């Protein structure tokens, strides 16, 4: 009896001693840590899963092997958090992956298509690396990959940026592809994106509003693309966005055009004007008059008992220094009160002149004939100094020559009365006013 009890006790002891080893067995081709829940089977030339893997493993590294197909082979590992199947010969992502995955790397395989079924139930996945494959198409569905924060699709054969990318993405790497376009609305939901890598592609331009919602962006790479710097209509949006964004831009496209836009934003110029300035001195009669001088030089020729004629010269000199902005039109300085319809013609500008006359004839009243003969004919001539070339003739002058012809009196000569002198002065002023109005 005692012998049987002792025999049973030894068996129980051996069973209790071996039980932990049975529960925590590690495959011979792998190394295990963290209580055999982290399993590393990389670089063992495996083509199938090694036997003896525990179903409660949380980390599995199968990289650098010769796997070509892992469909439905990883489904039992419902606690799996990290899966590395990079550097194998897989042509597609394994079907029926456990939904517990957080991180998955499938880089450097032969995957040509990332189909919607490959990621349909990966609600917990945060990191997905499918770089260095042969991807030509990526199909994503809305409301899948809800937790995805990092998506690496670099070094593939993509020609358009994938649509329906998850809104929680922080990092998207699309570098080293053959990307040529971004479809409208592709990036509109990526409001949490902080890093976007687009270098080494074939972009020529970025469509309007493509980057407008990337408000959290911290870094973007744009170098080594085929930007159409000479097509301003297409490239203007990207250049303005580069100037205004707070993100760090690596590889600024069309640097010369960006510098030009920065200068224009710092020194804005009204439409139709250029930024150059030049000075024009005393070139135009139509301006505010700084100095107005009038010179009266009476010249009287007498014959016995008659007045043959009288000649009076009025000289008007205008001067003005003005600075103008260069435009595409001819340079003409117009006063503030010049009518709008006159500002488009050199002739209108030259004809507009205002002369203020003083009473210079009152002292010559004694020269007026007192005869009852008809009013003397008056001849007025105006010589305008409008230059044909402003740069060659900067000073402008206007000369008014007034000549009055009087008939010969046969009667006795006597000093003219004051009434006759006033009549002559009034007629002269009226005629002068009429001439100035006609000239204007």
From Swiss-Prot:
- A single GO cellular-component term on record: myelin sheath
Q: Where in the cell is it found?
A: Cell membrane
The protein's topology relative to the membrane is: Lipid-anchor; GPI-anchor
Posttranslational mods: O-glycosylated in its Ser/Thr-rich repeat domain.
**Ser/Thr-rich repeat residue intervals:** 229-270, 271-292, 293-335, 336-377, 378-416
The signal peptide annotation in the UniProt record is 1-24
Query: GO molecular-function annotation terms?
Result: identical protein binding; protein homodimerization activity
UniProt keywords (A-Z) are: Cell adhesion, Cell membrane, Glycoprotein, GPI-anchor, Leucine-rich repeat, Lipoprotein, Membrane, Repeat, Signal
Pro-peptide region(s): 418-440
Q: Where are the LRR-type repeats located?
A: 56-78, 79-100, 101-121, 124-145, 147-168, 169-189, 192-213, 216-239
Q: Found in which tissues?
A: Oligodendrocytes and myelin of the central nervous system.
Q: Where is the LRRNT domain?
A: 25-55
Q: Which residues form a coiled coil?
A: none
Q: Which residues are glycosylated?
A: 45, 61, 103, 152, 176, 189, 192, 234, 364, 389, 425
**Could you tell me which residues are lipidated, with the kind given as GPI-anchor amidated serine?**
417
Primary role: Cell adhesion molecule contributing to the interactive process required for myelination in the central nervous system.
Record-linked PANTHER family: OLIGODENDROCYTE-MYELIN GLYCOPROTEIN (PTHR47114:SF2), PTHR47114
Q: From the Swiss-Prot or TrEMBL record, give the protein name.
A: Oligodendrocyte-myelin glycoprotein
List the top taxonomic levels of the source: Eukaryota, Metazoa, Chordata, Craniata, Vertebrata
């Amino acid at each position: 009896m005692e012998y049987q009890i002792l025999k049973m006790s030894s068996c129980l002891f051996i069973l209790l001693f071996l039980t932990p080893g049975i529960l925590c067995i590690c495959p011979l081709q792998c190394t295990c840590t963290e209580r055999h829940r982290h399993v590393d089977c990389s670089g063992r030339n495996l083509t199938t899963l090694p036997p003896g893997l525990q179903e409660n493993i949380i980390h599995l590294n199968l990289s650098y092997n010769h796997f070509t197909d892992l469909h439905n082979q990883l489904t039992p590992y419902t606690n799996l958090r990290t899966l590395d199947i990079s550097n194998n010969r897989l042509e597609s992502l394994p079907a029926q992956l456990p939904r517990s995955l957080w991180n998955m790397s499938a880089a450097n395989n032969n995957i040509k298509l990332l189909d919607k079924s490959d990621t349909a139930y990966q609600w917990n996945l945060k990191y997905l690396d499918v770089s260095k494959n042969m991807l030509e198409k990526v199909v994503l569905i809305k409301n899948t990959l809800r937790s995805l924060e990092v998506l690496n699709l670099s070094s593939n054969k993509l020609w358009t940026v994938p649509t329906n990318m998850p809104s929680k993405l922080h990092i998207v790497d699309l570098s080293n592809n053959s990307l040529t376009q971004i479809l409208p609305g592709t990036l509109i939901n990526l409001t949490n994106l902080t890093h976007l890598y687009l270098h080494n592609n074939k972009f020529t331009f970025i469509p309007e509003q493509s980057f407008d919602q990337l408000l959290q962006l911290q870094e973007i790479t744009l170098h080594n693309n085929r930007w159409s710097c000479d097509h301003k209509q297409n490239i203007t949006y990207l250049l303005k966005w580069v100037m205004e964004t707070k993100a760090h831009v690596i590889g600024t496209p069309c640097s010369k055009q960006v510098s030009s836009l920065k200068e224009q934003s710092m020194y804005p110029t009204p439409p139709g004007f250029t930024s150059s300035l030049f000075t024009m001195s005393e070139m135009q009669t139509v301006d505010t008059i700084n100095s107005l001088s009038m010179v009266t030089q009476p010249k009287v020729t007498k014959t016995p008992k008659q007045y043959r004629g009288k000649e009076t010269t009025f000289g008007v000199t205008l001067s003005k220094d003005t600075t103008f902005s260069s435009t595409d039109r001819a340079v003409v300085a117009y006063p503030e009160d010049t009518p709008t319809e006159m500002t488009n013609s050199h002739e209108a500008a030259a004809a507009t002149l205002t002369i203020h006359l003083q009473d210079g004839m009152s002292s010559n009243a004694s020269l007026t004939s007192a005869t009852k003969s008809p009013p003397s004919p008056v001849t007025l001539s105006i010589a305008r100094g409008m230059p044909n070339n402003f740069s060659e003739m900067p000073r402008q002058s206007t000369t008014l020559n007034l000549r009055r012809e009087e008939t010969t009196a046969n009667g006795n000569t006597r000093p003219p009365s004051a009434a006759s002198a006033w009549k002559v002065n009034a007629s002269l002023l009226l005629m002068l006013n009429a001439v100035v109005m006609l000239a204007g």
